[in-house]
């Protein structure tokens, strides 16, 4: 098994600002990392897969980067609608793991 450590657990952002979320893996997983957005009462939404590929229909304000053990999700031009909890999810051989989540609070 492997672990994903996500930081910070919570972050406050101003509208128009930038948010950076980090995800560190205990094993090198290449680019097998995805990012999800979760809002209350809604299923998780895939934002990024293979570390940096934007999922269909997702705003280019979301950017994924990294490989191996260090990954980053950057949200630029933060909007009120970005208030949510964000998770990284990695795959290592047959095993999958999620980070602990980052709550993004948007102040307008």
UniProtKB/Swiss-Prot annotation:
Coiled coil spans: none
Record carries keyword Cell inner membrane: no
Region annotation Framework-4: where it falls in the sequence: 98-107
Region ranges (Complementarity-determining-3): 89-97
Region (Framework-2): 35-49
One GO term (biological process): adaptive immune response
Record keywords, A-Z: Adaptive immunity, Immunity, Immunoglobulin
Chain segments carrying region Complementarity-determining-2: 50-56
Ranges where the record places region Complementarity-determining-1: 24-34
PANTHER family named among the record's database cross-references: IMMUNOGLOBULIN LIGHT CHAIN
Miscellaneous comment as given in the Swiss-Prot or TrEMBL entry: This chain was obtained from antibody to Micrococcus lysodeikticus cell wall and was isolated from the serum of a single rabbit.
Record-given protein name: Ig kappa chain V region 120
The species this protein was found in: Oryctolagus cuniculus (Rabbit)
């Amino acid at each position: 098994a492997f672990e994903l450590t996500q930081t910070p657990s919570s972050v406050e952002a101003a509208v128009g600002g930038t948010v950076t979320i980090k995800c560190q893996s205990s094993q090198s997983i290449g680019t097998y990392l995805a990012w999800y957005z979760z809002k209350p009462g809604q299923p998780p939404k895939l934002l990024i897969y293979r570390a940096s590929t934007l999922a269909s229909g997702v705003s280019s304000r979301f950017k994924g980067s990294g490989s191996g053990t260090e990954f980053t999700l950057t949200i630029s031009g933060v909007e009120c609608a970005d208030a949510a909890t964000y998770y990284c999810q990695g795959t290592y051989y047959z095993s999958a793991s999620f980070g602990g989540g980052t709550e993004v609070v948007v102040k307008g």
